[in-house]
């Protein structure tokens, strides 16, 4: 899908190799200002063509003096747009403007106290407060015309600004939650130094995306969307349905690996709230047949993926055959998000793909043009747009769920009996976490069945050998990193008691308290 014509002028985050570049863009958007990420290798011409409202120079792992270190193009500072430097970007900006970056040998990593002397960025904040530092080199002299507004033990110039030039920067990372006042500082740059308006709201986003989809598909075009039951595909489908009405057909493949109530939720709640046409393919038997005897995690993923391709192909072929008016479907809707675009090297331009490229396995003589209405959004924005469109909270607030479903939450062979055990345990855990009001604190809570493990237990007057269930509650902002959620003991006790009493063949419940890294969120 091409860059929407209605997208506002972006605040461009120039990525110098930072692990937080996407997070910076998210923080800008949280301030109701549109932002995108561009690589530092982008030419001045390419950046200028995006008509940026401001530039933010991200952090990075390098020293400005290191061989091969990413370079700031000085011409970017001459575009006449506001510029904000963070960490490495702060040093690179200083270096380019004639300040001095010293290799002091005094490194600062983690929580660090800074002392500020006012200025626009820090005015009104505590004179001494904690920020998150991650630097080796340090700026010891600001460029001419800049006012030094903060310092730390290892950074003589920890913040500087020149309001007249609409330029500022900080040595620390304002985008991370370990800098408690970081978002305030970022917003002050955007609104008070750069003078930008805060107009990027869920209502505006939704209407812009609807208009863009309507323009792409046209007055007579037809589209197909594969629903997974997740929030991304649901919101993408709702946007397209709002744009083209009954010219959209949704296909939902029930592979038998769903959690309790998920198929019904799609068939009832989604259809009721959108009015979309829906075809459900009941393919549980086909998937279980392919998974018989398979225990290797990667082999399971591949088997599920390959069978999904075939199932989706059959469902689409059936839809085209049963609805002659849909035989000229030219568009395929997908719930691609902005992090996917950035991580894949993203680029603009219409994506015309062979049908087997992304969902795979469609007839070779069928070509679709991709419609990706969410390709500029982060997950939290997708949820906000979903609420704006009137989707039920059960769909919008749904925790992330892997495509292979419960198939990769059973450690061992996947069977119908084991799926039923896991569904019951998962439903109990989800219900009790919701009842405890913890849905807002937990990014997701995989429930895992150790099907190949037999744990000894005592129930009643006899010894039992049952399977352990693992609870994996994690908190995260983007799933790139995660911490285990500190669920109150009384809630854990209730979950454990219910599972061991109500679910057959389970006699032990354990909690996974591993952060990511080193552990991934899913077990397989």
From Swiss-Prot:
GO molecular function: ATP binding; GMP synthase activity
Keywords, ordered alphabetically: ATP-binding, Glutamine amidotransferase, GMP biosynthesis, Ligase, Nucleotide-binding, Purine biosynthesis
Domain GMPS ATP-PPase: 200-398
Entries under SUPFAM superfamilies matching the protein: Adenine nucleotide alpha hydrolases-like, Class I glutamine amidotransferase-like, GMP synthetase C-terminal dimerisation domain
Binding-site list for ATP: 228-234
Top EC category: ligase
EC identifiers of the protein: 6.3.5.2
Catalytic center residues: 87 (nucleophile), 173, 175
Ranges where the Glutamine amidotransferase type-1 domain occurs: 10-199
Cytoplasm listed as a keyword: no
Catalytic activity of the protein: XMP + L-glutamine + ATP + H2O = GMP + L-glutamate + AMP + diphosphate + 2 H(+)
Pathway: Purine metabolism; GMP biosynthesis; GMP from XMP (L-Gln route): step 1/1
GO cellular component: cytosol
Function: Catalyzes the synthesis of GMP from XMP.
Quaternary structure (record): Homodimer.
Entries under NCBIfam families matching the protein: guaA_Cterm (TIGR00884), guaA_Nterm (TIGR00888), PRK00074.1 (NF000848)
Name this protein carries in UniProt: GMP synthase [glutamine-hydrolyzing]
Protein's organism: Corynebacterium ammoniagenes
Record lineage: Bacteria, Bacillati, Actinomycetota, Actinomycetes, Mycobacteriales
Gene that encodes the chain: guaA
């Amino acid at each position: 899908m091409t860059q929407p014509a209605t997208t506002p002028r972006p605040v461009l985050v120039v990525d110098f190799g930072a692990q937080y570049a996407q997070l910076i863009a998210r923080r800008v958007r949280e301030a109701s200002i549109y932002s995108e990420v561009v690589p530092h290798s982008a030419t001045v011409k390419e950046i200028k063509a995006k008509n940026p409202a401001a530039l933010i120079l991200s952090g990075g792992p390098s020293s400005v003096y290191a061989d091969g270190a990413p370079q700031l193009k000085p011409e970017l500072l001459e575009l006449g747009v506001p510029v904000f430097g963070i960490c490495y970007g702060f040093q690179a900006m200083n270096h380019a403007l004639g300040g001095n970056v010293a290799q002091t040998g005094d490194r600062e990593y983690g929580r660090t106290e800074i002392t500020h002397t006012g200025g626009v960025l820090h005015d009104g904040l505590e004179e001494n407060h904690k920020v998150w530092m991650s630097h080796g080199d340090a700026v010891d002299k600001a460029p001419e015309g800049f006012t030094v507004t903060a310092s730390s033990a290892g950074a003589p110039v920890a913040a500087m600004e020149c309001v007249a030039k609409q330029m500022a920067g900080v040595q620390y990372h304002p985008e991370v939650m370990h800098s408690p006042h970081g978002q305030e500082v970022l917003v002050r740059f955007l609104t008070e130094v750069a003078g930008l308006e805060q107009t990027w709201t869920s209502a505006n986003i939704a209407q812009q995306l609807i208009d863009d989809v309507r323009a792409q598909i046209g007055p007579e075009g037809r589209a197909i969307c594969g629903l997974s039951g997740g929030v991304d595909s649901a919101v993408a489908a709702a946007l397209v349905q709002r744009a083209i009405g009954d010219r959209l057909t949704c296909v939902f493949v029930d592979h038998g690996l769903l959690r309790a109530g998920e198929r019904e939720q799609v068939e009832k709640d989604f259809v009721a709230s959108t009015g979309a046409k829906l075809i459900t393919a009941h393919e549980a038997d086909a998937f279980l047949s392919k998974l018989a005897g398979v225990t290797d995690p990667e082999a399971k993923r591949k088997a599920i993926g390959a069978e999904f391709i075939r199932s989706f192909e059959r469902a689409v072929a059936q839809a085209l055959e049963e609805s002659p008016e849909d035989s000229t479907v030219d568009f395929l809707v997908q719930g691609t998000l902005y992090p996917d675009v950035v991580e894949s090297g993203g680029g603009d331009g219409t994506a015309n793909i062979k049908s087997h490229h992304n969902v795979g396995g469609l007839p070779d003589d069928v070509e679709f043009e991709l419609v990706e209405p969410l390709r500029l959004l982060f997950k939290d924005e997708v949820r906000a747009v979903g609420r704006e469109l009137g989707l039920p909270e059960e769909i919008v607030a749904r925790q992330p769920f892997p495509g292979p479903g419960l198939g990769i939450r059973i450690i061992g062979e996947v069977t119908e009996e084991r799926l039923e055990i896991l569904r019951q345990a998962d439903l109990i855990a989800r219900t009790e976490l919701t009842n405890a009001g913890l849905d807002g604190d937990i990014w997701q809570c995989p429930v895992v069945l150790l099907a190949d493990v037999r744990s000894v237990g005592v129930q009643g007057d006899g010894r039992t050998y049952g399977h352990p269930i693992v609870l994996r509650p994690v908190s995260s902002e983007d799933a790139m990193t995660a911490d285990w959620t500190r669920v109150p003991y009384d809630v854990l006790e209730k979950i454990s008691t219910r599972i061991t009493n109500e679910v057959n063949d389970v006699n032990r419940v354990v909690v996974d308290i591993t952060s990511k890294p080193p552990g991934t969120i899913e077990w397989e």
